[in-house]
Structure formats: structure tokens, C-alpha cells
């Protein structure tokens, strides 16, 4: 995951960062460390003009299952040339990935405390078709922030 921060970063006595700005790559159901930066930094930029990189959190998340870690990957359409800006990456409708991802999440977390409380908020991401990966990822981040009661300043 590509991340960078600007100068003028302050630390609290317990070591937490009180910073000014962070630059993050887009992420599909981002890891906790990614979400933590939304809370720590005063301003967060999510890069939409960087070139898409395969095998990154841009279209992949990792969940914990009874059998270990499982990666869930959003399929993307092929693009012309060697590079394509993240903002132009289209989600492929090939296969039943939405159904498979939702079933994997339900299987892994369905018996967890509070899953029923959050399931109705998360299910729509697997029922609706999305055109662009960046937009899909940002809608997920917005919903996660709402559920976690985090109000980041994201651009």
C-alpha cells in the first residue's frame, strides 16, 4: 500500500501521531491501518490518478476465516497499454464474484457478535453493480466511516 505523509507531524505523549496530511492509495475494504490514518490525520488524500497495480489492496482485501486468511479480489476489465490510472479501472462483471465475496464474509463472520447489526449496511455493496473500482472503494470507505463514527477530511 503506498502511503506518504507531509512534515509538521506531532506526537502525543502516548506515541499517537497528530499529523496534518496523508496520501493513501484506494483500497477495497481497507485494512485497519489504512482506516486508522483517516482518524489520525487532519487531511487525507486518496490517490485517484496513480497507475493501477495488480495484487494490491486496490482491488483485494483479506479476511480471517476458520481455515486461515482468505483473499477476496474484485475482478477488473483489461485495459489498453501497460498502465491505467486508478480512476479509469472498470469492475468486471465476469463470474459471480459479488455473490462469492458476500458468502465468504457471511461464512467467516456470520456468527460474530454484531454481524447482524452491520450486515444490512454491507450487503448492498454485493448486490449492486458498480462501474469504476475507485468509486466502489470510496463508497465502501464512506460507509465504514459512517458505521465507525469517524468523520475524516478526505479529498
PLM segments and residue spans:
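Residues lining hydrophobic/aromatic ligand-binding pockets adjacent to catalytic sites
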Residues: 2-155
Amino acid at each position: 500500500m503506498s502511503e506518504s505523509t507531509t512534515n509538521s507531524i506531532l506526537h502525543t505523549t502516548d506515541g499517537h501521531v497528530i499529523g496534518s496530511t496523508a496520501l493513501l492509495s484506494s483500497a477495497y475494504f481497507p485494512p485497519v491501518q489504512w482506516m486508522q490514518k483517516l482518524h489520525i490525520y487532519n487531511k487525507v488524500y486518496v490517490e485517484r490518478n496513480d497507475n493501477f497495480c495488480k495484487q494490491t489492496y486496490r482491488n483485494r482485501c483479506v479476511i480471517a476465516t476458520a481455515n486461515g486468511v482468505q483473499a477476496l479480489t474484485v475482478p477488473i476489465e483489461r485495459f489498453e497499454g501497460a498502465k491505467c490510472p486508478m480512476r479509469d479501472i472498470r469492475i468486471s462483471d465476469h463470474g459471480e464474484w459479488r455473490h462469492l465475496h458476500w458468502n465468504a464474509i457471511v461464512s467467516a463472520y456470520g456468527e460474530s457478535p454484531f454481524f447482524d447489526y452491520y450486515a444490512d449496511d454491507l450487503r448492498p455493496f454485493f448486490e449492486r453493480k458498480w462501474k469504476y473500482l475507485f468509486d466502489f472503494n470510496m463508497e465502501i470507505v464512506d460507509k465504514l466511516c459512517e458505521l465507525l463514527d469517524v468523520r475524516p477530511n478526505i479529498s
